Swiss-Prot record:
L-tyrosine binds at Y35, Y170, Q174. Pfam families: SYY_C-terminal (PF22421), tRNA-synt_1b (PF00579). Disulfide bonds: none annotated. Its EC number is 6.1.1.1. ATP binds at K233. Transmembrane segments: none annotated. It comes from Mycobacterium sp. (strain KMS). This is Tyrosine--tRNA ligase. Keywords: Aminoacyl-tRNA synthetase, ATP-binding, Cytoplasm, Ligase, Nucleotide-binding, Protein biosynthesis, RNA-binding. Belongs to the class-I aminoacyl-tRNA synthetase family. TyrS type 1 subfamily. PROSITE patterns: AA_TRNA_LIGASE_I (PS00178), S4 (PS50889). Residues 355-412 form the S4 RNA-binding domain. SMART domains: S4 (SM00363). It comes from the Bacteria.
Amino acid sequence: MSSILDELDWRGLIAQSTDRDALAAELAAGPMTLYSGFDPTAPSLHAGHLVPLLTLRRFQQAGHRPIVLAGGATGMIGDPRDTGERTLQTADTVADWADRIRGQLERFVEFDESPTGAIVENNLSWTGALSTIEFLRDVGKYFSVNVMLDRDTVRRRLEGEGISYTEFSYMLLQANDYVQLRKRHGCALQIGGSDQWGNIVAGVRLVRQKLGDTVHAMTTPLVTDSEGKKFGKSTGGGNLWLDPEMTTPYAWYQYFINTADADVVNYLRWFTFLEAGELAELEEATRDRPHQRTAQRRLARELTTLVHGEDATRSVEHASQALFGRGELAALDEPTLAAALREASVAELTPSGPDLITDLLVATGLSASKGAARRTIAEGGVSVNNMKIDSDEWTPQASDFLHGRWLVLRRGKRNIAGVQRVG
């Protein structure tokens, strides 16, 4: 039987680790408690958080106990980043975001009374009670400023506009989290993204210096696509959020269904729990029959179900099929239809019009001009609610509007837009 480290290796999920042999030996000796931290720098986690979250889940399935740490304290400070100082949020805002994120964290690991049952902590519970004197004596005394200045992000910031003491001290707070979790739960491994390596190793050193214990560190790779672009950015450039109010399940599904062939197998390794044999079959399908997009559909289905549940997955799959002419639009509930259309483009239709099909195509951006719209119609490339339009004089009747106010326009096979009747 392969070890959890072997599993992570073949999936490509280990970027760096402290003494690998020592870590493997301790994992083999019995259940280990490990943790990963998530700062509430927004009201929701985003897709980039899935790698460490799912790594916690993999460890749990292998018989180990995960701790998910909400950064109620560190979220008020902010880890230094290359783009400059973070805007400090109020304590109430961070507390609200921490509560929301805690609820999201609880979806990804199992909470029960078993030895592997997950634990949720908030680092505000110990950091908030720490006085300035205690922080400087009990934590700061163990850190060399020279070492802290050598961190890549800090060095780049110092070469630019500089860095505040607030963000400079972040490493100390994160390191102290490891000490506290070691004392409270016997935690022996911290995992995080590879950009957190310096902070995590600082925690390993602090545990050794303060408690005399040897603990471990491991990072997962920062996920980029085959073109080097950061994973998890929506088509508009924003984050792909786990909160359905911030990124709809339809938009989430579409992001993954549109994954490039060059990326889809890696994403299946990193973000799903499919076994090696099935992944090999999906890799073969992508290589031999890329037009079928079998792997992309499986990826989108797995991740939408993981984050939003089976009902949401069925709903968005029905919506996707219906919007692209392979299902019944009238069967879609209005919230799903509206969310799907808003991810494309929606033009409003007022009682005063204009409502000629050529005007609607231009208003939604499906055609650059009325002349272009007429040509597309003449070529048979326009449909409304999956019904082909053969006249450039067509106007919608009341009975054409889905749920009394929506039209679905399509140009060609994949260009979709909506019209919403208002007023």
